[in-house]
Amino acid sequence: MNNSRYVLALDPSGAYKEGSGTTGWCLYDIEKQKILKIGSLYAGDYSCQFHYWDAHIDLIDSMEGYHPDVVIEDYLLYGDRAEAQVNSRLETPQLLGIIKYEVWKRGLFIYIQTAAQVKTRWNNNILIHKNVIQKEGLNHTIAGTKVSDHILDSVRHAIHYSTYNSKYKRR
């Protein structure tokens, strides 16, 4: 059931062998409409693909006290990018499958959103206007911390889910 007060949003990249995968994540409090935690997982920090993938499960387990709904950006193969994926191992969809299964095993609610659902609706200008992020020079920050595009995307997913899909009733 998708009625948790908290949402863990993930913008996953499974690319371990095919580049430097980076997963951005955000823990969001729906009641206070506030970002509690943000971070990234970098494939290059792990000795093998399985350790990188396992770090995602460790992240989910570290949020156990919040019992969050988990929102994940889906992977879609768009026609204009399909040729670039020829002979690809499609590591990100593999990682998505692992995350979905592990979230289900833990009894957490999982919700999948596309990038297209959130990128326009919650663009940087809107997030700045709503005081979710700040612009400092060429960088975007959250509470004074410079954030990557992957973290920004996870924030977009958390806010979109909170606004349109969560069944949590704010007091």
Protein language model annotation of sequence segments:
Residues 1-171:
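Phosphate- and other anionic-substrate recognition elements at nucleic-acid/protein interfaces
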